[in-house]
A protein has these predicted regions:
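Accessory beta-strand-rich segments of carbohydrate-active enzymes
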Residues: 45-47, 79, 95-109, 118-231, ...
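Catalytic beta-strand/loop cores that center a nucleophilic Ser/Cys/Thr
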Residues: 785-793, 801-899, 915-960
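Short alpha-beta junction capping motif
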Residues: 757-802, 882, 907
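N-terminal carbohydrate-binding accessory modules
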Residues: 236, 306-372, 744
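Beta-strand-rich binding/interaction modules
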Residues: 157-159, 245-275, 282-284, 305, ...
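Accessory carbohydrate-binding/adhesion or oligomerization-edge regions at the termini
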Residues: 28-110, 191, 195-198, 907, ...
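Extended acidic/polar, glycine-enriched regions
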Residues: 180-185, 251-329, 720-752
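Substrate-binding/catalytic cleft of secreted carbohydrate-active enzymes
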Residues: 369, 379-622
Length: 961
C-alpha cells in the first residue's frame, strides 16, 4: 500500500531549519550515489546498413576506437559534406546551388554550404559503442543503473548480450535499470541511432542540421550507479515563500519485489515511511527558518537538503538544491516572490559550434549567461530544445531565468502521437530539472498548432505550479490565451478575440517613434512576452572565421567572404561590419525601448543576442555565434536600453528645424533590485563635444518597481542653439548607473539653396549632364531609378532574418560615410546610418558602381546584403573630361524631407567652393558604363579564384563612437 505521510505529523516531527547556501556550485540532484565513470576510450563500429541488431554485434568485440563523452562526427567518423548529403532540414537548404556565382562551392572536395555552418563530417544512422566494465565486490546485491546524461538519439543497451530497455528522450538523461550485476568483469554495448524518428518536423533544433543538431554520440556524465534494491527515484521540492517552508515529494522505487518500511531522513531528522512491492511515495513539509532568503536574479540564494531512505533493503540518499521562490501572475502581470517581474530574454537553440553538442559543464553555461547579463538581459528562451542540467545549475547560481521547450517544432492534437511524445518529454523535463529555481517557464514547442496546448498547459500547471506554462511559443492563435495557459509568447494578437495588433515591429512603425504596443493587449488577461523580437541582420566581420576551430566549419561565412572579394568590397570589411552593426543596434534600441514603454507587456524574447548560423545564416546578434562581443557595441552600451533600470523618452521625431521645440515626456522602466528612494531624475542635451547646451532635473521622489513611471517633461527651444548640429538627449537618475540617450539633429530653416546660385547644374538627365560636363561645368546628377542597373532599393531598417530565406526582404545593411569629406561638412553625421538618414534613403536605389574603376571610393557607400556584396554608392564624385561630377542616389528635386534639404545644401555649398576637386577621373565611356553596363558583366564571378586573403592584415579602425 502506498503511504503518504500526513503533513501535520511531519511538521510536528521536523522542526529544524535548512541552512542557507550561498550562490556557489552545489551538487546536482542526481550526484549523491556511488558511481563509476565510463569516460575514456571505447570500442566502436559504424553500422551504415543497420545490420548490427540482427547480426548480434552486441555479442561481438568491436574493433574501431572512439572517446566518450564525445560524438563520432567530431572524431573523424562519417562522410565528407557533398552535394547529396542527406541533411535533416527543410527550410531552404536546396536551391542555392542553382546560383552560378556559387558554382565553385558545389565541386567535390570543395562543397561549402552558404545556408548554414556545416559539420566536418556528417552521418545519419546507427553506431555501436562498447567497453568492458568491472563491478566492484561492494556492489553485490545492489541494483545497478546505466546513466547517460545526453545521447542522440535512440539508445539501446546490452550487458553480456542481454538487452535492456531503450531510451529516446531528447531532453533528459537516458537511464537503464540493469538490475543486480554480479561483481566482476562484464561487457557493455550501446547502440545509438541518430536518424530522424517519431515523424518530427525536421527543423526543430533538437534534431536538425540547421545548427548542427544531428550528432551521434553520448556526452556529459556516463556512469554506472549503484543503489539499494529500494531507492529514492525522485525528490521534488515545492517551496512556499509565504510560509517559508518546503514540501518534499519523494518517489520510492522497489526492485526487491517485497513490501517494506523504513525511515525517510532529512538532514538527520527521521520520519516513518512504507512502500509496497511496486514502490511508494511520501510527502514531507519542512520549515526553512524565518531568516530563509528568497531566490531571484539579484539574490540567487540556494537552499540545500539531503534526503535519505533507510529500511528493509533500502539505503539511498539524494542531495537536492532549490530556491525559495514562487512565480505567479495576475491579469497581464508576472510576479516573482510577490514582486512584479519583467523578462528581458534572448533566444538560444542549445547550439555549440566548437563541440557540436550542448555543453554539460557548468562553467560553459556560466560564460554564456554572464554575457547575457552584461548586456542587460535576465533570461533565455530555448527554441525547440531543453538544455542539460548544467545550464539550469549555472542559471540558479547566477540568477537567470529559463524558459525551456519540448524538443519539437510540431503541432499537437488531442490523442495524437505527437501529444503522447510531448507528455513523455514533459514528464522527463519536470523530473530532472523541476527543482531548479531558474526554471520558471515551459512551452511545448516553437510556433506549434493543434488543440492540445491548453489541455497540456492546464494539466501541467495543476501538477507542478512551480513554473508557468504556455500553449506554444510564438503562434498568434486564440488558443494561446485560452483557459489553461498561464502566459503566452506572441508576435501579435490579431487572432485574439477583441485583440488585434503588433507586439513587435521590424519595419519601424509608430511604436518606434515614442509610441508603444499597448492597444494590442486590450483584451488579453494573461502575461504576454513579445516573441522573437528583432531578427535584424548586420554585415559580418570575416575575422570571425578564424574563431571556428572545432566541429562546425563556417562554410557560410567563407562563401560570403569569397563573394566580397570577388565584388571588390573585402578591403572595407571592417568599416562595413562596424557601420552595419551600428545601424542594426539603432533598430534594436528603437524596438526594445518600445517594448519597455508598453503598459501590460511582460517582456521580450529577442532573436537574438548572438548570431544564428542556420536557416540561411541570420547574423542577427550583437555578439557573434561563439558569444564573443562585436566591435560596434559593448555590453554596457546595450544595457542602457535593455537593462533592469532604463529611462525612456517618448520622442515623436528626431530631426528638427531650428524654429521648432524639442518636447518629450520621459518615464522610467524600473525592474532593478529595489525601488529607488529619494531618486533625482535629470536630463541634459549635449553636443558632439560632450558639453551640455541645456539641462535640468526633476524633484526627488521614490520610484517604485514597474514600468511607465513618470519622470517629467523635456522642453528645449532649438532656436537658441547653433544649427546644423547633432545633439544628444541624455536622461538618468543621479547616483545610479541608470542612464539612456538619444541622438537628435537640428537644421536651419534657411537650408534651402538654388543650384544655379551655387553655379551647379542639377539634373535627372544623363544626356544633359554629359553636355554640361563636356563644357567644363559642375554637375549634380540625380539618376532616375529606371536608369540604374542592378541597383537595389534602400530601406530604413536592416535586413530581416536573412535574404536567402526571405529573398523579397530589403537588402539594406547600412551606410558607410566618409565623415571627413567636405561634401558632408554641413550635414552632421557619424559614419553609419542613423535616424537622420533613414527616411532620407528609404526606397532610394543605391547606385551599383561595379562598372566603374576600382579606384572609385564613394563618399557614402551602401552596405549590401552579405549574400551578394555588390559595390554600392549613395554619393560619389569624379572628374569627367573637363567637368566635375557629383552623383547622388537621393533625388532632391521636389523633396520636402528635412534631412534631404540639409544634405542638398551641404553638397551645393561644397560644389560651389574650391574644395570640389574630385580625385578620380572617369572617361566618358567609364561614366556611361555605370548607368548602362551590367554588374554581372564587369564583376568577377564568385566562381573565379579569389585574391589572396591575408588573415593577419591590419584592419582599418572604425571611427570612435
Amino acid at each position: 500500500m502506498l503511504v503518504k505521510i500526513p503533513r501535520w505529523s511531519l511538521v510536528a516531527l521536523v522542526t529544524f531549519g535548512l541552512g542557507l547556501v550561498a550562490p556557489v556550485s552545489l551538487p546536482a540532484a542526481e550526484t549523491a550515489v556511488p558511481a563509476i565513470s565510463l569516460a575514456g576510450p571505447w570500442r566502436f563500429a559504424l553500422d551504415r546498413d543497420d545490420a548490427g541488431f540482427t547480426g548480434q554485434w552486441y555479442a561481438k568485440d568491436l574493433t574501431d576506437k572512439i572517446q566518450l563523452p564525445g560524438i563520432l562526427q567530431g572524431q573523424g567518423y562519417g562522410d565528407d559534406v557533398a552535394m547529396d548529403t542527406p541533411w535533416i532540414a527543410a527550410l531552404g537548404v536546396r536551391g542555392w546551388q542553382n546560383n552560378k556565382e556559387l558554382a565553385r562551392f558545389t565541386e567535390p572536395g570543395n562543397v561549402k554550404i552558404p545556408w548554414f555552418a556545416q559539420p566536418a563530417k556528417h552521418y545519419l544512422g546507427v553506431a555501436w559503442y562498447q567497453r568492458d566494465i568491472d563491478i566492484p565486490a561492494s556492489w553485490a546485491g545492489k541494483r545497478v543503473e546505466l546513466f547517460l546524461e545526453r545521447a542522440h538519439w535512440q539508445t539501446m543497451a546490452w550487458v553480456d548480450g542481454k538487452q535492456y530497455n531503450y531510451e529516446d528522450s531528447l531532453v533528459a538523461p537516458h537511464v537503464s535499470d540493469l538490475g543486480a550485476l554480479t561483481p566482476g568483469h562484464h561487457q557493455l554495448t550501446i547502440r545509438v541511432d541518430n536518424r530522424l524518428m517519431n515523424n518530427q518536423r525536421v527543423d526543430g533544433h533538437s534534431v536538425s542540421d540547421q545548427l548542427g543538431g544531428t550528432w551521434n554520440g553520448i556526452v556529459g556524465r556516463i556512469e554506472l550507479r549503484a543503489t539499494s534494491p529500494v531507492w529514492i527515484a525522485d525528490a521534488q521540492v515545492f517551496p512556499s515563500v509565504t510560509k517559508k517552508t518546503a514540501v518534499i515529494n519523494v518517489t520510492i522505487a522497489n526492485d526487491s519485489g517485497q513490501a517494506g518500511s523504513g525511515n525517510l531522513v532529512v538532514n538527520g531528522v527521521n520520519a516513518p515511511v512504507q512502500w509496497d512491492a511496486n514502490g511508494g511515495s511520501a510527502q514531507m513539509e519542512v520549515p526553512l527558518g524565518t531568516n530563509a532568503q528568497t531566490w531571484d536574479e539579484f539574490h540567487p540564494t540556494l537552499q540545500h537538503l539531503t534526503v535519505t531512505l533507510k529500511g528493509n533493503t533500502a539505503d539511498d540518499s539524494k542531495d537536492v538544491s532549490f530556491g525559495l521562490r514562487e512565480i505567479s501572475f495576475h491579469e497581464k502581470d508576472l510576479f516573482l516572490n510577490g514582486r512584479l517581474l519583467n523578462l528581458r530574454g534572448t533566444h538560444f537553440a542549445d547550439e555549440f559550434p566548437l563541440t557540436g553538442y550542448p555543453a554539460t559543464d557548468v562553467d560553459s553555461w556560466k560564460k554564456i549567461i554572464e554575457v547575457c547579463k552584461s548586456y542587460g538581459l535576465n533570461g533565455m528562451r530555448f527554441h525547440s530544445s531543453c538544455p542539460p542540467d548544467a545550464a539550469f545549475e549555472a542559471a540558479d547560481e547566477l540568477g537567470f531565468y529559463i524558459q525551456a521547450e519540448g524538443p519539437f517544432w510540431d503541432s499537437f492534437g488531442p490523442g495524437s502521437n505527437n501529444s503522447k511524445r510531448l507528455d513523455a518529454e514533459t514528464a522527463m523535463i519536470r523530473k530532472f530539472y523541476g527543482n531548479h529555481p531558474s526554471f520558471i517557464m515551459l512551452s511545448p514547442s516553437n510556433e506549434s498548432g493543434g488543440a492540445y496546448g491548453p489541455t497540456w498547459a492546464a494539466a501541467n500547471y495543476q501538477a507542478d505550479p512551480r513554473r508557468l506554462y504556455a500553449t506554444s511559443t510564438g503562434n498568434d492563435n486564440a488558443l494561446n490565451v485560452a483557459t489553461g495557459a498561464t502566459y503566452a509568447s506572441m508576435p501579435h494578437t490579431n487572432s485574439v478575440p477583441g485583440g488585434g495588433g503588433l507586439l513587435r515591429s521590424n519595419n519601424g512603425g509608430p511604436a518606434w517613434w515614442g509610441g508603444d504596443y499597448g492597444d494590442s493587449l486590450r483584451n488579453v488577461h494573461i502575461p504576454i512576452l513579445a516573441h522573437e523580437v528583432g531578427q535584424l541582420c548586420a554585415y559580418p566581420d570575416f575575422d570571425e572565421i578564424k574563431e571556428f576551430t572545432g566541429f562546425l566549419r563556417p562554410s557560410n561565412l567563407e562563401v560570403f567572404r569569397a563573394s566580397a572579394a570577388a565584388h571588390g568590397v573585402l578591403d572595407h570589411n571592417k568599416e562595413f561590419s562596424w557601420a552595419s552593426g551600428r545601424f542594426q543596434l539603432l533598430s534594436y534600441k528603437l524596438e526594445l525601448e518600445a517594448n519597455l514603454r508598453t503598459p501590460g507587456l511582460s517582456g521580450f524574447q529577442i532573436l537574438d543576442l548572438h548570431d544564428y548560423l542556420g536557416q540561411g545564416t541570420a547574423l542577427v546578434g550583437v555578439v557573434d555565434a561563439l558569444w564573443h562581443p562585436k566591435s560596434y557595441v559593448t555590453g554596457a552600451e546595450y544595457a542602457r536600453f535593455a537593462g533592469p533600470v532604463v529611462p525612456l523618452a517618448r520622442l515623436s521625431k528626431r530631426v528638427y528645424l531650428n524654429n521648432e521645440m524639442l518636447e518629450s515626456d520621459v518615464e522610467l522602466y524600473n525592474f532593478g533590485e529595489k525601488p529607488l528612494v529619494g531618486a533625482v531624475p535629470y536630463w541634459t542635451v549635449v553636443g558632439l563635444d560632450g558639453k551640455a547646451v541645456a539641462q535640468g532635473e526633476w524633484p526627488a521622489r521614490d520610484l517604485p518597481i514597474g514600468k511607465n513611471i513618470p519622470l517629467g517633461h523635456v522642453s528645449v527651444d532649438w532656436s537658441k542653439l547653433p544649427a546644423p548640429r547633432e545633439y544628444r538627449l541624455v536622461v538618468g537618475i543621479r547616483g545610479t548607473k541608470a542612464e539612456n540617450d538619444w541622438n537628435l539633429w537640428v537644421y536651419p530653416t534657411t537650408a534651402s539653396v538654388d543650384p544655379q546660385t551655387a553655379g551647379v547644374f542639377e539634373t535627372n538627365s544623363w544626356t544633359d549632364a554629359q553636355d554640361y560636363l563636356a563644357k567644363g561645368g559642375k554637375v549634380l546628377y540625380l539618376p532616375p531609378a529606371d536608369s540604374l542597373v542592378n541597383s537595389p532599393p534602400l530601406d530604413n531598417v536592416p535586413i530581416f532574418w536573412n535574404r536567402q530565406m526571405n529573398p523579397r526582404e530589403s537588402a539594406m545593411s547600412g551606410l558607410w560615410c566618409d565623415i571627413a569629406h567636405p561634401a558632408l561638412a554641413e550635414f552632421p553625421t557619424e559614419a553609419y546610418c542613423d535616424l537622420e538618414w533613414t527616411e532620407l534613403v528609404k526606397n532610394v536605389r543605391a547606385i551599383n558602381v561595379e562598372g566603374a574603376p576600382a579606384a572609385l571610393k564613394p563618399i557614402v557607400s551602401a552596405v549590401d546584403d552579405y549574400n551578394r556584396n555588390w559595390k554600392l554608392a549613395v554619393l560619389f564624385e569624379a572628374k569627367v573630361g573637363p567637368g566635375r561630377l557629383m552623383v547622388s542616389a537621393v533625388n532632391f528635386i521636389g523633396s520636402r524631407d528635412t534631412s534631404a534639404t540639409q544634405l542638398h545644401r551641404s553638397l551645393l555649398d561644397y560644389m560651389a567652393g574650391d574644395k570640389f576637386q574630385p580625385l578620380l577621373t572617369l572617361t566618358r565611356a567609364q561614366a556611361d558604363n555605370i548607368w548602362t553596363g551590367s554588374a554581372a558583366d564587369v564583376a568577377a564571378p564568385i566562381g573565379a579564384p579569389p585574391p589572396e586573403i591575408d588573415e593577419g592584415r591590419t584592419p582599418t579602425p572604425a571611427p570612435k563612437t
